[in-house]
Amino acid sequence: MASSLLLALLFLTLATVVNLKTDGPCPACWGATFDLESHRELLLDLAKKSILDKLHLSQRPILSRPVSREALKTALRRLRGTRAETLLEHDQRQEYEIISFADTGLSNINQTRLEFHFSDRTTGGVEVLQTRFMFFMQLPPNTTQTMNIRVLVLRPYDTNLTLTSQYMLQVDASGWYQLLLGPEAQAACSQGHLTLELVPESQLAHSSLILDGVSHRPFVAAQVRVEGKHRVRRRGINCQGLSRMCCRQEFFVDFREIGWHDWIIQPEGYAMNFCTGQCPLHVAGMPGISASFHTAVLNLLKANTDAGTARRGSCCVPTSRRPLSLLYYDRDSNIVKTDIPDMVVEACGCS
């Protein structure tokens, strides 16, 4: 309900701004007279609404289980060292990497049970591609240990966990270890919960076999993919001076300014940008506008233009966008890395 009211208020305010200036044929053609600073709050609200919509969130996450900065830095450093490849801009599918830190479950001297919680991301064609378990072990010098790692799942209509697969890992030194988990673990992650049980083959006289301290907290990294659309990058013309021609107006959204720096880890902000300016008839008809919240606003403004205007001119609209790479906490305090499509306006043209 609050989201709908915000959207309605935003549309109404933008429409009011444009209707005060009806000297142009297109409501998007604000030209050089558009006062950026006076509408700053309005644009920031638009940016927040767009990000939440693309992340399928009704409101910003409230962190229930904060993760220490030391654990966060360690996890990101380990992942960057083991996964060098990056998402390509021409990849047609949106990818996420979700990092879930372990909560200690039912454990004793013979075993350690770790619980990992994932938000429900299985809707909308999301596929879990890979699941990796990363943990730190500390052993006395000149010691070898064999660790049995079990994947436990809760079957439908069952109250007990079921063993679905297990892995044997030999450890001969203290340090970080990673294990690539199979389809059973991937299925568990897609259902929102994964349980791992670590059982040493022999008992060692050591108080901290598996460290779950501040900087050695075990975690699972799940790589998932969702189908998307192919985008082609084009260069745009930035607005300069007093030019009234169609151009790209740069606008930076600072996440600290809007109070989102506590749940968005990286980046510190992004260049939202928008299109403004006039479109002469001889440059009209450029294709390439893609459906987005930005486009919906412009379409509504166009519909609210003075009904008495007989001639509808060409509009200055986005013709190319690129994704926003975002690293953030979800509502379960998991770390999510994703590229949100169509967030940064790269080029503008005349519709």
Curated annotation (Swiss-Prot):
It is found in: Secreted. PROSITE patterns: TGF_BETA_1, TGF_BETA_2. Residues 1-18 form the signal peptide. One of its GO terms (molecular function) is growth factor activity. One of its GO terms (cellular component) is extracellular space. The keyword Glycoprotein applies. SMART domains: TGFB (SM00204). Disulfide bonds join 239-247, 246-316, 275-348, 279-350. Keywords: Disulfide bond, Glycoprotein, Growth factor, Hormone, Secreted, Signal. Pfam families: TGF_beta. Glycans are attached at residues 110, 142, 160. Residues 19-236 form a propeptide. PANTHER family: INHIBIN BETA C CHAIN, TGF-BETA FAMILY. Belongs to the TGF-beta family. Inhibins and activins inhibit and activate, respectively, the secretion of follitropin by the pituitary gland. Inhibins/activins are involved in regulating a number of diverse functions such as hypothalamic and pituitary hormone secretion, gonadal hormone secretion, germ cell development and maturation, erythroid differentiation, insulin secretion, nerve cell survival, embryonic axial development or bone growth, depending on their subunit composition. Inhibins appear to oppose the functions of activins. Homodimeric or heterodimeric through association with alpha and beta subunits, linked by one or more disulfide bonds. Inhibins are heterodimers of one alpha and one beta subunit. Activins are homo- or heterodimers of beta subunits only. This is Inhibin beta C chain. It comes from Rattus norvegicus.
